[in-house]
Amino acid sequence: MKNSDVLQLADDMKLEAVPAYNTTPGRDKFHPKGRDNGYILTLGGTRIYIAGDTEDIPELNQVKDIDIAFLPVNQPYTMTPEQAIRATQIIKPHILYPYHYGNTDINKVKEGLKNEKTTEVRIRALQ
């Protein structure tokens, strides 16, 4: 799939490819614009956003009505905690699972979103 492709998998199951890329100068070589995807999976009435390796890109403004978001937090390849906070504030998911965070202090994301009443941050050790 390429950016903006939509695949109807079943009557109640759809997969949308959304852009995923780096914007930080010097890091854009890791994930150049136009090459990689994140995905929105719709299962019945539930929308799940899996961002892929990306930063807080302008296209996030088109990511709407998300129930569960998976955002990567691990510079130099993905978002900083501050970028993940901004991305969450744009997307406004009901539930956020930060992932791909390695040695990043992921509690910065939870702390930065503590006043966001519409999003529950769930930190899990994802293998």
Each model region followed by its residue ranges:
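Core dinuclear metal-dependent hydrolase active-site scaffold
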Residues: 1-64, 124-127
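Binuclear metal-ion centers of metallo-dependent hydrolases, dominated by the metallo-beta-lactamase
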Residues: 1-9, 85, 89-127
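Active-site environment of divalent metal-dependent phosphoester hydrolases
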Residues: 5-8, 24-25, 55-59, 76-81, ...
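Residue-identity detector for threonine
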Residues: 23-24, 42, 46, 54, ...
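Short, glycine/charged-enriched secondary-structure capping and boundary segments
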Residues: 30-31, 63-66, 83-87, 110-113
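Broad hydrophobic/π-residue packing in well-ordered secondary structure
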Residues: 39-41, 48-50, 77, 101-104, ...
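Proline-aspartate-enriched helix->loop->beta-strand connector
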Residues: 66-71, 75-98
